[in-house]
Amino acid sequence: MKVALPKGVFDIFPYITDAKHMWRHTSLWHRVEDVIHEVCDLYGFSEVRTPVFEKSEVFLHAGEQSDIVKKEMYTFLDKKGRSLTLRPEGTAPIVRSFIDNSMNQRDDNKFYYILPMFRYERQQSGRYRQHHQFGLEAIGVRHPLRDAEVLSLLWNFYSAVGLQGMQIQLNFLGGGTTRQRYDKVLREYFLEHFESLSSLSKERFNTNLLRILDSKETEDQEIIKSAPSILEYISDEDQKYFDEILTALNSLDIPHSINPKLVRGLDYYTDVVFEAITTFGGHSYALGGGGRYDGLVAASGGPSTPACGFGVGLERVMQTLLAQGNITLPSSHKLRLIPVESQADSFCFIWAQHLRGLGIPTEIDWTHKKLKNALKTADAEKATFVCLVGERELLSEQLTIKDMSSRQEFSGSKQEVEQRLLYEIQNTSL
């Protein structure tokens, strides 16, 4: 029987020519990941890599009533009966690592990650059972300008990869006085309309009231539309905090708007929450989101510690780049050596190693195809330069390099060719 992928997953690999699936091309993922590393480095964030699986309790602390915890986790028992879960989201493992490694001894901890997540999602466009997330967590500081800084990093990432039509939507879920006031009013409002709510929202009424605002059920939409806004009940202190974030975004010319119905899918968010929205082809959809989660560290067994962060689904980023026509695969500027005769094999093997030591990406075609077919393969493999090596080249000690894009050639001794290749690579825009 032929082996095949399970549902909900996909391969990322280099030999993709179908435009529809170009978002899965290895080179594109490398380009986007390079942007992430560069942007995070500019802001002083360091990469963290947590295990693929954690003790299940790590995610239960993050919100027992969230859809992820209740319906979507890949949970299993190991051979000793311990409950383990494949990582469904990135924040809870970072918090676990923060506590485990006593990082609270530092005043300010700034982390980012690019990791696969696992959720038993219903099959639909843009949703996968293994997906990849760029996440960022800033733990230890509570300040409105820290929140704005995190948002500016997110915005710089979207700009650097070439996404268009982006906007940040924000809301303030509050904590303390603000949340108490709002919960009371919201509960009374939904109680008046309880019989008209969907079965899912009726369940959430007693477990996570705010999540009703996030309902996608048809029967809930008119009720949600008329629900009171939390911004009508925000305390003076919280309003000042929120205003400072908005002022900072204005100062950086980051497009944004307030969405008083915005809540997040995980239970641990407090105070400011946000989503990055793109509008394309008449549709709006989120490419990432996050907020402040000042209570999660303490809920996970650590000291009371403020924190904020976000997560970005990279599959949607790649697919949106494709839809917007902004996918450009980076050039590798590689040289392909083609030994025309077997007596040139040893020369190509040794010279290729020397070229790589000079920083010139070099590969060798060992197939000994007919010359015409070998050049076709070099073209298909996106080789920038090609060098044919046969008996004539070995005897004359003169080599010819062909530029596959301009179809121009240059010849010389081995040393002359090396210098020309280095010049071409260093002076050509990648």
Swiss-Prot record:
PROSITE patterns recorded: AA_TRNA_LIGASE_II
Enzyme class: ligase
Family listed: Belongs to the class-II aminoacyl-tRNA synthetase family.
Known partners and oligomeric status: Homodimer.
Name recorded for this polypeptide: Histidine--tRNA ligase
Subcellular location, principal: cytoplasm
Catalytic activity: tRNA(His) + L-histidine + ATP = L-histidyl-tRNA(His) + AMP + diphosphate + H(+)
Subcellular location per the Swiss-Prot or TrEMBL entry: Cytoplasm
One cellular component (GO) term of this entry: cytoplasm
Lineage: Bacteria, Pseudomonadati, Chlamydiota, Chlamydiia, Chlamydiales
EC number: 6.1.1.21
Source organism superkingdom: Bacteria
InterPro entries: aa-tRNA-synth_II (IPR006195), aa-tRNA-synth_II/BPL/LPL (IPR045864), Anticodon-bd (IPR004154), Anticodon-bd_dom_sf (IPR036621), His-tRNA-ligase (IPR015807), HisRS-like_core (IPR041715), HisRS/HisZ (IPR004516)
PANTHER family: HISTIDINE--TRNA LIGASE, MITOCHONDRIAL-RELATED (PTHR43707:SF1), HISTIDYL-TRNA SYNTHETASE (PTHR43707)
GO terms, molecular function: ATP binding; histidine-tRNA ligase activity
Gene: hisS
Biological process annotations from GO: histidyl-tRNA aminoacylation
HAMAP family assigned to the protein according to its UniProt record, in alphabetical order: His_tRNA_synth
NCBIfam families recorded: hisS
